[in-house]
């Protein structure tokens, strides 16, 4: 809804164009600086990123994986750093492959006695990995295993041995967001299963069978394991995975099978006494960003209990308390990150800490790591305007251990907005650039506003950025290098909505988009735009829409349903659910949301397909995608681009060579960001 003062002709006439449209033809992608309206407030030094944490058992040493991002925001060179938690100089572990891209350490894990820190290291330019170990003094690491394939989720077992998830002869990195292997030869025959393996005498002994892909695992005190697993293609079949028990040398039994196609399971944890397994279950659109309710399984009886049924929050990670009598939950409750203690004996969870900051290293996982014997925890905290730092201490009473980013700020006003859409109270974030500060009234305007009206604020453009998933959420993260930063530096406001289908308001809210893609969630987003216009001086004539993955789909969909946006940028979108079903490498994720395959019920797929309504598009739209994206394959972008080209709608399509669903090459990320900004600037320029 537009506020009345926005119609003032004098005000509209005074708004300068950001850039003449002729300067940004569709075939030219200048740097963002060439067109930014205000001067960007770039930090004096890079924003250091902390990607993983591991505390030694005695709590005296914190290991981390960290690095500085490129100008595009990608952290391509990563280091392992050790710091005494009591303070003191940090030590960097010298990696044998050096400080080069793809020399990627991961899976930090301390031995039970704290004398060894083991980790996985990828060999640059290959899918081969190795296990190495150092000590608390960051001594030169020694190799424990060289492996022809991928290794993930390394961890020490209570007996001092190492376990890992291993994929022999892997033809790609683990995960559907990684670039897919070339689709050549006989289809469906090149299947590589990821298995639980134990390092013993310089080699791996497999503890899970060769016909199952194991996604996550946890050790049992008797030497066995529990984990989530499914047969066949690991990228595709996580959505039908079951909770299983594994006994060496490879026996598997089912402990829990999801009760419906719209229930996925993740984050299995074993209690200290080995009698109970806890896990997260709920509808999840992606492996990695877990979310749902907390469940408990009694191993003796097989009884399964939902411990958080009906909660208005989403459990994103869980672990047993050090005493084993409760679960420690990492939750998202609308705009707040919450750490809660949930008694296993029953009762309501007790909130240990709640904040509107983001907690934890990386983009998904627990809010903190801990050393039970020492009673100390460590976390990474950040907000939209405050950069990440590592903090240590008791939960909620942390103090900064690092100061690398101290002094770096970003002048943005972040507002958590809540608006009504149908029966839902939808939450989102509105980010206002430093140029949005309203003019200060003089004394006469302040004390006699009836006779001397205060100055009107300048209207500012706004980009709505729709998150992927859809089972995910926009959460606070420091605005360092990246697309959001470019928009704000250009003087644009940014709206980050969390429509129905998102995490943060309980399982019923996350399930509210089942068989309704593009309808209720789009209403939520459009009502969010209205709410932003009531909360800030947003220019309704210069609204943009963008998103990646499901956000890319919503962008393609929205321009077939409304002409409200002046321009749109669809990243890795989906234009036709019917053709998409047979093109992507993860089609199992669609059954939970559509209720049946496209071959059984094509109509439910057609009603949510942008291509069904493609002749309604009038919005200039840029489409981009990675060449080897198996989650949202390039033909979906090509189909949308082809349709708009035939219909005479201004459009541009870009396919980035060799990239998967998540782009990695800094030059591609930089091109995408600059291209996106230039697209909005071009189409905003003649809308003032």
Describe the residue ranges of each PLM region:
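Residue-level detector of Asp-centered blade-edge/turn motifs that repeat once per structural unit
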Residues: 57-58, 112-113, 157-159, 220-222, ...
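Beta-strand-rich domains and repeat architectures in extracellular enzymes and scaffolds
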Residues: 42-78
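Hydrophobic beta-strand positions that form the internal "hydrophobic ladder"
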Residues: 62, 114-117, 162-163, 225-226, ...
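A flexible loop/linker signature enriched in serine peptidases of the S9 family
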Residues: 66-79, 96-104, 120-132, 146-152, ...
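Short loop/turn segments that connect beta-strands within beta-propeller blades
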Residues: 84-88, 135-139, 199-203, 247-251, ...
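Blade-loop segments of beta-propeller domains
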Residues: 89-119
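Serine-hydrolase catalytic core recognition
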Residues: 365-688
